[in-house]
Amino acid sequence: MANSLAIENVGEAQIITAEIWQSASSADIMLTMLLESRLFLTSSHHTPQLYLFAASCARRVNHLLQDPRSHEAIRAAELFATNASSSQHLLHSHLSARTAAFDLATTYNSHPLISTDQPNDDDHRSIPQVTLLGGALIHAAATASMACCPSEILNPLRAAETSARYAIKALYYEQLTNDTDSTLISQLLEEEQHRQSQALRIFLGNPFDSKRWPPFTITNNADIDNRVTACTTQQ
């Protein structure tokens, strides 16, 4: 009797978790769910889809990427996800893109330090515009670098989570650079979080109920291009 109740409780918890995943409007919530799932964190089953998700986040800040090495990193992640390139190429692209991000950091090093936390809305106007721009460009470059981070350096799930977080920060600093109204900034970031949540569902399906919502099956580059385009242009 006790065993049957335990099984029933586990089943109910699984259903609730799957429903939370399907309805979540924030990628933060969904990625936290995955990070807290020990089984998922140690599994390589969704690795290709995680690279595609990270690449889609990086493409959202494509307009802020100034170095060809950053653009190459995004494509390297997409190619690796389809077994169209080697792990050595992925590593080389990551290291090159990371160097590009470091180069940007060096360029803006003479300006006031850029905090990894989002500045207070009342404080950002006292920060030089060039510093805010540097924050946008550096976080965008870091997004691209993390999108193709090899698993031997960082777990693909953690790398994807970092890419998503850096992309949000890049867009945030971009809006501060443009002196956008704080209310509008909050709205834009909420929309970006929702867009990322949709991208996770597109690529990963529902890891907590994969029979009903299986992950995206990668067949060719055209499929990838279509999915990535959908993730980067959806409203």
Please place each PLM-identified region on the residue numbering:
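Structured binding/interaction patches within domain cores
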Residues: 1-235
